[in-house]
A protein has these predicted regions:
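Conserved short alpha-helical segments that host acidic/polar catalytic motifs at enzyme active sites
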Residues: 1-187
Length: 187
């Protein structure tokens, strides 16, 4: 399925780029990048393989725009990447590519919903449904993790999620298939 990557606390975007490119074999249908800095969320997505996105004029312009806004990458910068293998929702529709952002909530998803009665339009991404639901659990700066966790446990299929809300300074990672690998460096 899809590839989710992320790195927090590095000033050099090239470290993230190498990590994101390594995830390309997890999905060739589309890719996306999120940069979170001081509660500002910048994102780009396209129906391109990860390597094509990194070599695109669109990404170069995106990074120039961020630099024009004097955004400096530092130890509080989050870099997140997605490499999508199309399951539900056609990647030719940009609305289905990730990250999905709705009501100040950003979601990147690896997995597939199965047997979900809410999912009746299969031209739409199942991630859009998940994002809509997650956004309902954010109330200003408070996240209702208990009710979200009940919702997450009710999902049929396999899922790993990275999500945040622009009103919050927290980033959430959750999986129901135990496939989240991470490394923490105390430096």
């Amino acid at each position: 399925m899809c590839g989710l990557t992320g790195i927090i606390g590095f000033e050099d975007i090239n470290i993230f780029k190498r990590l994101h490119l390594e995830s390309e074999n997890r999905g060739y249908d589309s890719s996306g990048i999120v940069i979170i800095k001081e509660n500002s969320l910048f994102h780009i997505k396209d129906s391109l393989k990860t390597s094509e996105l990194w070599n695109s004029k669109k990404l170069k312009d995106f990074l120039k725009l961020i630099n024009k806004d004097h955004v400096k990458f530092d130890k509080k910068t989050f870099f997140l990447g997605h490499s999508r293998m199309e399951t539900n929702g056609f990647s030719i529709f940009q609305q289905n590519n990730q990250p999905i952002i709705e009501n100040n909530t950003m979601v990147m998803h690896n997995g597939i919903l199965t047997d979900n009665p809410e999912h009746t339009d299969y031209t739409l991404s199942d991630t859009r449904l998940i994002c809509k639901q997650i956004s309902s659990y954010f109330n200003k700066k408070f996240f209702d993790f208990k009710n979200f966790n009940n919702y997450f446990k009710s999902l049929k299929g396999y899922h790993s999620l990275i999500f945040t809300n622009t009103l919050s300074s927290e980033l959430y990672l959750i999986s129901n298939n135990k496939n989240i690998w991470y490394y923490h460096n105390d430096e």
